[in-house]
Amino acid sequence: MIQESELGKRIKEYRKKRELTLQEMEEKTGLTKGYLSKVENTRRAPPVSTLIVLAKALGISLSEILGETAERNKISLVKKIERQVVARNGTVFGYSYQTLAHKFYKKQMEPYILTLPVKPKQVPFFQHKGEEILFVLEGTMKFFHGDQEFVVEQGDCLYFDASIPHHGICQGKKEVKCLMVIYTPE
């Protein structure tokens, strides 16, 4: 299991190794210095979309931020028992996720199993460059994309522009599990 409390420290180490200031990271990522400082000093995992943006700005893979060693293979098999839980029992952002391709080096896409809890603490909108796919494996959720709202059930699939504010909220008494794939351009 990946320790959430280590992610911020690892990001800070990579930033300092590259001799980048928070101001320079702000310019590279579009995230404010204040937010970046919180990410580096928090004990909770930031949203996966933020981790991807930070990895690209640092010139590393998300796997490296997660502390995993990815192989330079043309194929990667991650067995169910090998999945890495990145944020357990939900985060301050209201969800948890498991990596599905952490063994593949320099991915163009980041696949996860996303779990939305029944009663999240808070659910902010997310917004980042790129595109996402959400395929609902279990449960029902209400999904917001800009000013649009969708009810998405087991077997339904969303493909959307991630630069538009978006988020999902569990509906009903059962958590929602989704296959989530994020593509963020270089």
Q: Which role fits each region the language model picked out?
A:
Residues K9-E26:
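Short basic helix-loop element that most often maps to the first helix and adjoining turn
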Residues T115-L116, H128-F143:
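Short, conserved beta-strand element in jelly-roll/cupin
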Residues F93-S96, E153-Q154, A162-E186:
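Ligand-binding loop in jelly-roll beta-barrel domains
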Residues L100, G146-D161:
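Short acidic-glycine-tyrosine-enriched beta hairpin
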Residues I11, L22, K33-Y35, V48-L51:
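Helix-turn-helix DNA-binding elements, focusing on the entry/boundary residues of the two helices
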Residues G30-R44:
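Recognition helix of helix-turn-helix/homeodomain-like DNA-binding domains
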Residues R15, M25, P47-L58, L62-L66:
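Hydrophobic micro-packing sites on short alpha-helices
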Residues K80-A87, F93-K103, E110-H128, A162-P165:
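Conserved short histidine dyad/triad with adjacent acidic residue
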